[in-house]
């Protein structure tokens, strides 16, 4: 939601229309098992032939390579003739239930790494993330 709001601020309020009627679609999603939010599936066919800017958040952060892989998976879910014209991904805060699930895991270095990452994700997207999105939007 923070990223979508920033996009509205940077690009200005546009007349809302269906994706089928838009020239450019900004498609934002949290990352679900490495892919787009499943709730978006029914809207994706409307993006055929459209220019699409992909953006989103994922719980694991800190690696551009990981973000790029996630964005590639996002793009692979679009219709074949949709044209990705830009991308942005940053870390996103996860629900407390995720932390509880990590806490219930057997004590291990992996468990600690996951807990540490969860704690780093708190408050994201943060100002630096929003500034990163702001930097790429004017090119649209």
Locations of the language-model features?
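FMN-binding flavodoxin-like domain, especially the glycine-rich phosphate-binding loop
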Residues: 6-14, 24, 32-140
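Short, charge-patterned binding micro-sites
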Residues: 28
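Short acidic/histidine-rich motifs immediately flanking catalytic phosphotransfer sites
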Residues: 19-25
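Short amphipathic alpha-helix
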Residues: 1-3
